[in-house]
Amino acid sequence: MLAKRIIPCLDVDNGRVVKGVQFVDIKDAGDPVEVARRYNEQGADEITFLDITATHHGRETTYDMVERIAETVFVPLTVGGGVRKIEDIRNLLNAGADKVAINSAAVFTPEFVAEAAAKFGSQCIVVAIDAKQVEDVEGQPRWEIFTHGGRKPTGLDAVAWAVKMAELGAGELLVTSMDGDGTKKGYDLALMKAITSAVNVPVIASGGVGNLQHLADGVLEGGADAVLAASIFHFGEYSIAEAKQFMAKQGIEMRL
Protein backbone atom coordinates (compact mmCIF):
# COMPACT_ATOMS: atom_id res chain seq x y z
CA MET A 1 0.00 0.00 0.00
CA LEU A 2 1.31 3.45 -0.89
CA ALA A 3 1.95 5.82 1.99
CA LYS A 4 -0.64 8.55 2.34
CA ARG A 5 0.58 12.11 1.87
CA ILE A 6 0.21 15.31 3.86
CA ILE A 7 0.23 18.40 1.66
CA PRO A 8 0.30 21.91 3.14
CA CYS A 9 -1.28 24.39 0.76
CA LEU A 10 -0.03 27.89 0.07
CA ASP A 11 -2.86 30.07 -1.23
CA VAL A 12 -0.96 33.04 -2.64
CA ASP A 13 -2.44 36.46 -3.36
CA ASN A 14 -0.27 39.38 -4.47
CA GLY A 15 2.90 37.63 -3.36
CA ARG A 16 1.72 36.63 0.14
CA VAL A 17 0.38 33.41 1.60
CA VAL A 18 -3.20 34.04 2.70
CA LYS A 19 -6.02 32.01 4.20
CA GLY A 20 -9.72 32.68 3.85
CA VAL A 21 -12.98 31.18 5.05
CA GLN A 22 -15.17 29.80 2.24
CA PHE A 23 -12.93 31.59 -0.27
CA VAL A 24 -13.38 35.05 1.33
CA ASP A 25 -12.40 36.85 4.59
CA ILE A 26 -8.65 36.67 3.94
CA LYS A 27 -5.84 36.65 6.56
CA ASP A 28 -2.10 37.06 5.87
CA ALA A 29 0.03 33.98 6.64
CA GLY A 30 3.49 35.05 5.51
CA ASP A 31 6.05 35.00 2.71
CA PRO A 32 5.56 32.03 0.33
CA VAL A 33 9.24 31.10 0.12
CA GLU A 34 9.66 31.15 3.91
CA VAL A 35 6.43 29.24 4.51
CA ALA A 36 7.43 26.62 1.92
CA ARG A 37 10.89 26.29 3.49
CA ARG A 38 9.32 25.68 6.90
CA TYR A 39 7.08 22.92 5.55
CA ASN A 40 9.95 21.31 3.68
CA GLU A 41 11.93 21.19 6.96
CA GLN A 42 8.91 19.83 8.86
CA GLY A 43 8.68 16.84 6.50
CA ALA A 44 5.75 17.69 4.23
CA ASP A 45 5.31 15.01 1.56
CA GLU A 46 4.47 17.63 -1.06
CA ILE A 47 3.64 21.32 -1.21
CA THR A 48 0.86 22.93 -3.23
CA PHE A 49 1.06 26.57 -4.36
CA LEU A 50 -2.17 28.12 -5.67
CA ASP A 51 -2.23 31.65 -7.03
CA ILE A 52 -5.81 32.18 -5.90
CA THR A 53 -6.65 35.35 -7.81
CA ALA A 54 -4.78 34.61 -11.05
CA THR A 55 -7.83 33.31 -12.93
CA HIS A 56 -10.15 35.95 -11.51
CA HIS A 57 -7.82 38.77 -12.55
CA GLY A 58 -6.55 37.03 -15.71
CA ARG A 59 -2.94 37.17 -14.51
CA GLU A 60 -0.20 34.60 -15.08
CA THR A 61 1.14 32.75 -12.06
CA THR A 62 4.30 34.34 -10.75
CA TYR A 63 7.05 32.25 -12.29
CA ASP A 64 9.87 33.85 -10.32
CA MET A 65 8.20 32.97 -7.03
CA VAL A 66 7.70 29.39 -8.21
CA GLU A 67 11.41 29.27 -9.10
CA ARG A 68 12.39 30.52 -5.65
CA ILE A 69 10.15 28.00 -3.91
CA ALA A 70 11.39 25.15 -6.13
CA GLU A 71 14.98 26.04 -5.23
CA THR A 72 14.07 25.99 -1.53
CA VAL A 73 12.11 22.74 -1.22
CA PHE A 74 13.05 19.16 -2.03
CA VAL A 75 9.60 17.63 -2.18
CA PRO A 76 7.18 17.59 -5.13
CA LEU A 77 5.66 21.02 -5.81
CA THR A 78 2.24 21.41 -7.42
CA VAL A 79 1.42 24.85 -8.80
CA GLY A 80 -1.94 26.18 -9.98
CA GLY A 81 -3.72 29.43 -10.73
CA GLY A 82 -4.38 31.02 -14.09
CA VAL A 83 -3.28 27.96 -16.07
CA ARG A 84 -5.03 28.29 -19.43
CA LYS A 85 -2.60 27.24 -22.17
CA ILE A 86 -0.06 24.52 -22.86
CA GLU A 87 2.59 27.23 -22.69
CA ASP A 88 1.53 28.06 -19.10
CA ILE A 89 2.16 24.45 -18.09
CA ARG A 90 5.52 24.36 -19.85
CA ASN A 91 6.57 27.60 -18.15
CA LEU A 92 5.59 26.33 -14.71
CA LEU A 93 7.38 23.01 -15.19
CA ASN A 94 10.44 24.91 -16.41
CA ALA A 95 10.22 27.15 -13.33
CA GLY A 96 10.49 24.05 -11.14
CA ALA A 97 6.93 22.81 -10.59
CA ASP A 98 6.62 19.01 -10.55
CA LYS A 99 2.88 19.06 -11.21
CA VAL A 100 0.50 21.68 -12.54
CA ALA A 101 -3.08 22.11 -11.35
CA ILE A 102 -5.75 23.06 -13.89
CA ASN A 103 -9.08 24.35 -12.58
CA SER A 104 -11.29 26.81 -14.49
CA ALA A 105 -9.64 26.07 -17.85
CA ALA A 106 -10.63 22.40 -17.55
CA VAL A 107 -14.27 23.44 -17.24
CA PHE A 108 -14.20 25.72 -20.28
CA THR A 109 -12.07 23.42 -22.45
CA PRO A 110 -12.05 19.82 -21.16
CA GLU A 111 -9.88 18.76 -24.14
CA PHE A 112 -7.13 20.96 -22.67
CA VAL A 113 -6.66 18.31 -19.96
CA ALA A 114 -6.27 15.56 -22.56
CA GLU A 115 -3.84 17.68 -24.57
CA ALA A 116 -1.78 18.52 -21.48
CA ALA A 117 -1.66 14.89 -20.35
CA ALA A 118 -0.60 13.76 -23.83
CA LYS A 119 2.15 16.37 -24.00
CA PHE A 120 3.58 16.25 -20.48
CA GLY A 121 2.30 12.95 -19.05
CA SER A 122 -0.64 12.36 -16.71
CA GLN A 123 1.71 12.20 -13.72
CA CYS A 124 2.18 15.98 -13.77
CA ILE A 125 -1.40 17.04 -14.53
CA VAL A 126 -3.69 17.67 -11.55
CA VAL A 127 -7.28 18.79 -12.05
CA ALA A 128 -8.55 20.95 -9.19
CA ILE A 129 -12.26 20.63 -8.50
CA ASP A 130 -14.05 23.22 -6.34
CA ALA A 131 -17.43 21.79 -5.36
CA LYS A 132 -20.37 23.11 -3.39
CA GLN A 133 -23.37 21.14 -2.13
CA VAL A 134 -26.63 21.99 -3.88
CA GLU A 135 -30.01 20.25 -4.13
CA ASP A 136 -31.25 18.55 -7.26
CA VAL A 137 -34.84 18.84 -8.52
CA GLU A 138 -35.99 16.13 -6.11
CA GLY A 139 -34.36 17.92 -3.18
CA GLN A 140 -31.56 15.35 -2.97
CA PRO A 141 -28.08 16.67 -2.19
CA ARG A 142 -25.48 16.71 -4.94
CA TRP A 143 -22.31 18.68 -5.59
CA GLU A 144 -21.83 21.30 -8.27
CA ILE A 145 -18.54 22.57 -9.74
CA PHE A 146 -17.77 26.27 -9.27
CA THR A 147 -15.00 28.22 -11.01
CA HIS A 148 -13.16 31.53 -10.57
CA GLY A 149 -12.25 30.96 -6.94
CA GLY A 150 -15.74 29.71 -6.18
CA ARG A 151 -17.52 32.69 -7.70
CA LYS A 152 -19.19 31.11 -10.74
CA PRO A 153 -21.55 28.10 -10.76
CA THR A 154 -21.23 25.81 -13.78
CA GLY A 155 -24.18 23.42 -13.49
CA LEU A 156 -21.71 20.51 -13.70
CA ASP A 157 -22.08 17.57 -11.32
CA ALA A 158 -18.83 17.18 -9.37
CA VAL A 159 -18.75 13.37 -9.29
CA ALA A 160 -19.50 12.95 -13.00
CA TRP A 161 -16.95 15.69 -13.74
CA ALA A 162 -14.28 13.92 -11.67
CA VAL A 163 -14.86 10.73 -13.67
CA LYS A 164 -14.60 12.65 -16.95
CA MET A 165 -11.36 14.38 -15.90
CA ALA A 166 -9.76 11.07 -14.94
CA GLU A 167 -10.82 9.59 -18.29
CA LEU A 168 -9.29 12.56 -20.13
CA GLY A 169 -5.94 11.94 -18.49
CA ALA A 170 -5.75 13.83 -15.19
CA GLY A 171 -3.20 11.99 -13.06
CA GLU A 172 -4.65 13.29 -9.82
CA LEU A 173 -7.70 15.20 -8.59
CA LEU A 174 -7.56 17.93 -5.96
CA VAL A 175 -11.09 18.08 -4.54
CA THR A 176 -12.03 21.08 -2.41
CA SER A 177 -15.31 21.37 -0.56
CA MET A 178 -16.15 25.05 -0.80
CA ASP A 179 -18.70 24.65 1.99
CA GLY A 180 -15.88 23.45 4.23
CA ASP A 181 -13.06 25.76 3.15
CA GLY A 182 -11.53 27.45 6.19
CA THR A 183 -14.41 26.44 8.50
CA LYS A 184 -12.35 23.90 10.50
CA LYS A 185 -15.32 21.51 10.59
CA GLY A 186 -13.60 18.76 8.61
CA TYR A 187 -13.65 17.58 5.01
CA ASP A 188 -16.96 16.92 3.25
CA LEU A 189 -16.51 13.17 3.64
CA ALA A 190 -19.60 12.29 1.59
CA LEU A 191 -18.22 14.29 -1.35
CA MET A 192 -14.76 12.70 -0.99
CA LYS A 193 -16.19 9.18 -0.73
CA ALA A 194 -18.45 9.74 -3.76
CA ILE A 195 -15.46 10.81 -5.86
CA THR A 196 -12.81 8.39 -4.54
CA SER A 197 -15.13 5.44 -5.14
CA ALA A 198 -15.91 6.62 -8.69
CA VAL A 199 -12.38 7.21 -10.03
CA ASN A 200 -9.18 5.18 -10.18
CA VAL A 201 -6.70 8.06 -9.90
CA PRO A 202 -5.38 9.50 -6.62
CA VAL A 203 -7.63 12.04 -4.91
CA ILE A 204 -6.40 14.83 -2.63
CA ALA A 205 -8.97 15.92 -0.03
CA SER A 206 -9.16 19.65 0.66
CA GLY A 207 -11.34 22.14 2.49
CA GLY A 208 -12.21 22.39 6.16
CA VAL A 209 -9.49 20.82 8.31
CA GLY A 210 -9.60 22.02 11.92
CA ASN A 211 -7.78 19.22 13.76
CA LEU A 212 -5.66 16.12 13.17
CA GLN A 213 -8.63 13.76 13.32
CA HIS A 214 -10.05 15.51 10.27
CA LEU A 215 -6.89 14.59 8.32
CA ALA A 216 -7.19 10.94 9.38
CA ASP A 217 -10.91 10.92 8.50
CA GLY A 218 -10.10 12.14 5.00
CA VAL A 219 -8.18 8.92 4.44
CA LEU A 220 -10.13 6.45 6.59
CA GLU A 221 -13.64 7.64 5.73
CA GLY A 222 -13.20 9.75 2.62
CA GLY A 223 -10.86 7.31 0.87
CA ALA A 224 -8.38 10.07 -0.04
CA ASP A 225 -4.81 9.27 -1.09
CA ALA A 226 -3.53 12.59 0.23
CA VAL A 227 -4.83 15.24 2.60
CA LEU A 228 -4.33 18.94 2.07
CA ALA A 229 -4.57 21.59 4.77
CA ALA A 230 -3.60 25.21 5.30
CA SER A 231 -4.81 27.01 8.44
CA ILE A 232 -3.86 24.33 10.97
CA PHE A 233 -0.27 24.42 9.73
CA HIS A 234 0.09 28.11 8.77
CA PHE A 235 -0.83 29.45 12.18
CA GLY A 236 1.20 26.92 14.16
CA GLU A 237 -1.62 24.87 15.68
CA TYR A 238 0.05 21.63 14.56
CA SER A 239 3.26 20.63 12.83
CA ILE A 240 3.45 18.25 9.87
CA ALA A 241 5.35 15.77 12.08
CA GLU A 242 2.56 15.78 14.69
CA ALA A 243 0.01 15.18 11.94
CA LYS A 244 1.97 12.24 10.53
CA GLN A 245 2.44 10.62 13.93
CA PHE A 246 -1.24 11.05 14.75
CA MET A 247 -2.30 9.43 11.46
CA ALA A 248 0.23 6.60 11.79
CA LYS A 249 -1.22 5.76 15.23
CA GLN A 250 -4.57 5.22 13.51
CA GLY A 251 -3.02 2.59 11.26
CA ILE A 252 -2.51 4.83 8.23
CA GLU A 253 0.75 4.19 6.40
CA MET A 254 2.80 7.41 6.48
CA ARG A 255 6.37 8.42 5.63
CA LEU A 256 7.61 9.39 9.09
Swiss-Prot record:
Which EC number(s) does the record attach to this protein? 4.3.2.10
Q: Which CDD domains match?
A: HisF (cd04731)
> Which leading EC class covers this enzyme?
lyase
What reaction gets catalysed by this protein?
5-[(5-phospho-1-deoxy-D-ribulos-1-ylimino)methylamino]-1-(5-phospho-beta-D-ribosyl)imidazole-4-carboxamide + L-glutamine = D-erythro-1-(imidazol-4-yl)glycerol 3-phosphate + 5-amino-1-(5-phospho-beta-D-ribosyl)imidazole-4-carboxamide + L-glutamate + H(+)
Q: Which GO terms describe its biological process?
A: L-histidine biosynthetic process
A GO molecular-function term, please? Answer: imidazoleglycerol-phosphate synthase activity
- Which Pfam families would you find in this protein's record? His_biosynth
Functional pathway? Amino-acid biosynthesis; L-histidine biosynthesis; L-histidine from 5-phospho-alpha-D-ribose 1-diphosphate: step 5/9
The keyword Transcription regulation is assigned to this record: no
> Is Amino-acid biosynthesis found in the keyword set?
yes
Tell me which residues this entry annotates as catalytic: D11, D130
Q: Which InterPro entries does the record cross-reference, listed alphabetically?
A: Aldolase_TIM (IPR013785), His_biosynth (IPR006062), HisF (IPR004651), IGPS_HisA/HisF (IPR050064), RibuloseP-bd_barrel (IPR011060)
Instruction: Write the record's keywords in alphabetical order, separated by commas.
Output: Amino-acid biosynthesis, Cytoplasm, Histidine biosynthesis, Lyase
Q: Which GO terms describe its cellular component?
A: cytoplasm
Q: What's the chief localization of this chain?
A: cytoplasm
Quote the subcellular location field of this record. Answer: Cytoplasm
Q: Do you know which HAMAP family this protein is assigned to?
A: HisF
Q: Which family does it belong to?
A: Belongs to the HisA/HisF family.
Subunit (UniProt): Heterodimer of HisH and HisF.
Q: What does this protein do?
A: IGPS catalyzes the conversion of PRFAR and glutamine to IGP, AICAR and glutamate. The HisF subunit catalyzes the cyclization activity that produces IGP and AICAR from PRFAR using the ammonia provided by the HisH subunit.
Q: What is this protein called?
A: Imidazole glycerol phosphate synthase subunit HisF
Which organism is this protein's natural source? Psychrobacter sp. (strain PRwf-1)
> What taxonomic classification does the UniProt entry list for its organism?
Bacteria, Pseudomonadati, Pseudomonadota, Gammaproteobacteria, Moraxellales
